[in-house]
Amino acid sequence: MELKLSNEKGEAAGQLEVSDQAFDAPFRESLVHQVVTAHLAGARAGTKAQKTRSEVAGGGKKPWRQKGTGNARAGTIRSPLWRGGGQTFAAKPRDFSQKVNRKMYRGALRSILSELARQDRLVVVKQLTVDAPKTRELKARLEGLGVREGLIVVDEIDANLELAARNLPRLGVVDAAGVDPASLVGAERVVITESAIRRVEEWLS
């Protein structure tokens, strides 16, 4: 299939022939959902920890005798019913990661990129550079491409480009090797350079 190719000013620069396997695949919603969910789950720290009644310090002595005080019976001041006591079902560190094999991961990327292309949300440019780390300069380039927010995918991240994009809200910059399903799904539009799309195509074909 062919994708529209633009220059940095947003002017048409011809057509780019790309692999049907990578950019004209059917959209598989269930697969995309599974892979994106797994990706986000893997980003969870899972370090939450609380103490049960047996782990909280103190509470070894019975607060008062069993009968005769008029108070409810109590065996420890670290009961979950008490302020400062342990948690009834205390949270412990856990691993939230889910297994996704390479075939599924690549299939999800193909589905997402193909759907972005079908919806005209994939903007292919010959190259995207800025002469200095100036947000104003990058913003002007993106507006010329009709992009206000989304994701920029380049072959290799340039320091000027990264610094210029850092001050723009809802705009991310990744290299071709760092493209992930969650970032693509969450992007309003994806700006990708010709060299980056060739690397992605090579990996997915």
Curated annotation (Swiss-Prot):
Residue numbers spanned by region Disordered: 43-78
One Pfam family matching this protein: Ribosomal_L4
UniProt entry keywords in alphabetical sequence: Ribonucleoprotein, Ribosomal protein, RNA-binding, rRNA-binding
GO biological process: translation
Keyword Ribosomal protein listed: yes
Single GO term (MF): structural constituent of ribosome
Origin superkingdom: Bacteria
Gene Ontology terms: cellular component: ribonucleoprotein complex; ribosome
Family under the similarity heading: Belongs to the universal ribosomal protein uL4 family.
NCBIfam families, A to Z: rplD_bact
Oligomeric and partner information: Part of the 50S ribosomal subunit.
Free-text function comment from the UniProt entry: One of the primary rRNA binding proteins, this protein initially binds near the 5'-end of the 23S rRNA. It is important during the early stages of 50S assembly. It makes multiple contacts with different domains of the 23S rRNA in the assembled 50S subunit and ribosome.
Full protein name: Large ribosomal subunit protein uL4
Phylogenetic placement of the source organism: Bacteria, Pseudomonadati, Pseudomonadota, Gammaproteobacteria, Chromatiales
